[in-house]
Amino acid sequence: MKWKDWVHVTKLDPDKQLGPGDIDAIAASGTDALMLSGTLNVTKENLLALQKMIAQYDLPLVMEPAGPEAVLMEGIEYVFVPSVLNTTDVQWIVGKHRSWVQQQDGKIPWDMVVPEAYIVLNPASSVGRVTKAVCDLKPAEVAAYTEVADRYFHFPIVYIEYSGTYGAPAVVKAAAEAIDHAILYYGGGINSAEKAAEMGKYADTIVVGNAVYDQGASVLKATVDAVQ
């Protein structure tokens, strides 16, 4: 299955702890892919430790780097690289990307790289604070960012990120109506089948992360079943 066909992705944070039984249950949940992603305290060491825990399972593995200093590429199917469109700091749009390219010095396997246009909408989240995102956006403004990402910059993914809180379905609906070519991702606060189904009406792909750590793999499976 290609990444464009995924409907459910599980986001795993290298700064959080999972037991072997948790990994078994996540792998058996029916999720389409596993994403290694975090905002704080992400290092190559804890990324490698998490990768080792999940390497035995036959699931696509995505690296979503928080910055150029910790990016895995070996044993990874795709590297999803975010650009935060609604930030006041150009580092999060293109600056860190330039640093990564310079550091790699021609070694980036570009056929693995999938650019993401992030629209971050939770000001209390780590990603919102770190990236200095302007989060108080109306649905029409989110739709406009989505159209810019899709039609002007040609990002293959537009990612509506509420990170830790459940977002407004009207906002995701507005983004869905504005999009033409890109795949629409939604992440944030999905911890039940009902929420998964609601956001799954508008987003092509839902991402579940915190619920895995807070409520366990049974909730994860319920979110998978709601969209598949």
Swiss-Prot record:
It comes from the Archaea. Pathway: Membrane lipid metabolism; glycerophospholipid metabolism. It holds the Pfam family PcrB. It is found in: Cytoplasm. It catalyses: sn-glycerol 1-phosphate + (2E,6E,10E)-geranylgeranyl diphosphate = sn-3-O-(geranylgeranyl)glycerol 1-phosphate + diphosphate. GO terms for molecular function: magnesium ion binding; phosphoglycerol geranylgeranyltransferase activity. SUPFAM superfamilies: FMN-linked oxidoreductases (SSF51395). GO terms for biological process: glycerophospholipid biosynthetic process. InterPro entries: GGGP/HepGP_synthase_I, GGGP/HepGP_synthase_sf, GGGP_HepGP_synthase, GGGP_synthase_archaea. Its EC number is 2.5.1.41. Sn-glycerol 1-phosphate binds at K11, Y159, I160, E161, Y162, S163, G164, G189, G209, N210. Mg(2+) binds at D13, T39. Its cofactor is Mg(2+). Keywords: Cytoplasm, Lipid biosynthesis, Lipid metabolism, Magnesium, Metal-binding, Phospholipid biosynthesis, Phospholipid metabolism, Transferase. It is an enzyme of class 2 (transferase). One of its GO terms (cellular component) is cytoplasm. PANTHER family: HEPTAPRENYLGLYCERYL PHOSPHATE SYNTHASE (PTHR40029:SF2), PTHR40029. Belongs to the GGGP/HepGP synthase family. Group I subfamily. Prenyltransferase that catalyzes the transfer of the geranylgeranyl moiety of geranylgeranyl diphosphate (GGPP) to the C3 hydroxyl of sn-glycerol-1-phosphate (G1P). This reaction is the first ether-bond-formation step in the biosynthesis of archaeal membrane lipids. This is Geranylgeranylglyceryl phosphate synthase. It comes from Methanoregula boonei (strain DSM 21154 / JCM 14090 / 6A8). The lineage of its organism: Archaea, Methanobacteriati, Methanobacteriota, Stenosarchaea group, Methanomicrobia.
